[in-house]
UniProtKB/Swiss-Prot annotation:
It catalyses: N2 + 8 reduced [2Fe-2S]-[ferredoxin] + 16 ATP + 16 H2O = H2 + 8 oxidized [2Fe-2S]-[ferredoxin] + 2 NH4(+) + 16 ADP + 16 phosphate + 6 H(+). The keyword Iron applies. InterPro entries: NifH/chlL_CS (IPR030655), NifH/frxC (IPR000392), Nitrogenase_Fe_NifH (IPR005977), P-loop_NTPase (IPR027417). This is Nitrogenase iron protein. GO terms for biological process: nitrogen fixation. [4Fe-4S] cluster binds at residues 94, 131. The gene is nifH. Its EC number is 1.18.6.1. Its cofactor is [4Fe-4S] cluster. Homodimer.
Length: 274
């Protein structure tokens, strides 16, 4: 079972990219579990046809310790197994702590056991690695390979570099490695070349460039992944290609984060700052 975590700046399209990629893997016959690690609990909605599933933390709050696995895992598109960690009530408690509680409970209830014959587990993780809870998948060895969703926008690249610092910090203890950058295009000038160069400087690869297409939003409005909504659309092939590249990936590295002035010089070199 491969353990994958998807990180990236808030709003960059991690949940959308994760679910569309998982749909590509599921279509290819892989058995996948998706663990949403975001208080918004939107990491599995498209795989479940728009169903806002009850989160692990909500279930614990309402039912106490008497929780069964089927209470917190739902079957989605092509038998994907979907669960959402959820978060505390707004203004109370720590969302990162909630992820730790949820993942530990999933382990106790046997969600990762061999009987499920999982090929992959994907963790879709909120925003930047800013606190220990959100770093938990990489800190505790829950995830072994990380993919960072980014774009040619400065803050997305800044966040990607920060996440690489987190991976570097925990690489020895948790054994986690960076599998590559996924460029979720925002149609920035020279975007592909810039992210390829960022990847090169970090010591990794741009594993795929996902072109911007409003069809992704249309599929979302219909509560589906692109592959589920219209398997013949060119954008569906982009996610199939990304899924195939992840499935065949052999490049796993400890990244070399950039200094902030190196990052700024990259932006200047490729024309954003001009």
């Amino acid at each position: 079972m491969r353990k994958v975590a998807i990180y990236g700046k808030g709003g960059i399209g991690k949940s959308t990219t994760t679910q569309n990629t998982v749909a590509g893997l599921a279509e290819a016959g892989k058995k996948v579990m998706v663990v949403g690690c975001d208080p918004k609990a939107d990491s599995t909605r498209l795989l479940l046809g728009g169903l806002q599933q009850k989160t692990v933390l909500d279930t614990l709050r309402e039912e106490g310790e008497e929780v069964e696995l089927e209470d917190i895992i739902k079957e989605g598109y092509r038998n994907t197994r979907c669960t959402e960690s959820g978060g505390p009530e707004p203004g109370v408690g720590c969302a990162g702590r909630g992820i730790i509680t949820s993942v530990n409970l999933l382990e106790q209830l046997g969600a990762y056991d061999d009987e499920w014959e999982l090929d992959y587990v994907f963790y879709d993780v909120l925003g930047d690695v800013v606190c220990g809870g959100f770093a938990m998948p990489i800190r505790d060895g829950k995830a072994e390979e990380i993919y960072i969703v980014c774009s040619g926008e400065m803050m997305a690249m800044y966040a990607a570099n920060n996440i690489c610092k987190g991976i570097l910090k925990y690489a020895d203890a948790g054994g986690v490695r960076l599998g590559g950058l996924i460029c979720n295009s925002r149609k920035v000038d020279n975007e592909r070349e810039m992210i390829e160069e960022l990847a090169r400087r970090l010591g990794t690869q741009m594993i795929h460039f996902v072109p911007r297409d409003n069809f992704v939003q249309r599929a979302e409005i219909n509560r589906k992944t692109v592959i589920d909504f219209d398997p013949t659309h060119p954008q569906a092939d982009e996610y199939r290609a990304l899924a195939k590249k992840i499935d065949e990936n052999k490049m796993f590295v400890i990244p070399k984060p950039l200094e902030i002035d190196e990052l700024e010089s990259l932006l200047i070199e490729f024309g954003i700052a001009n």
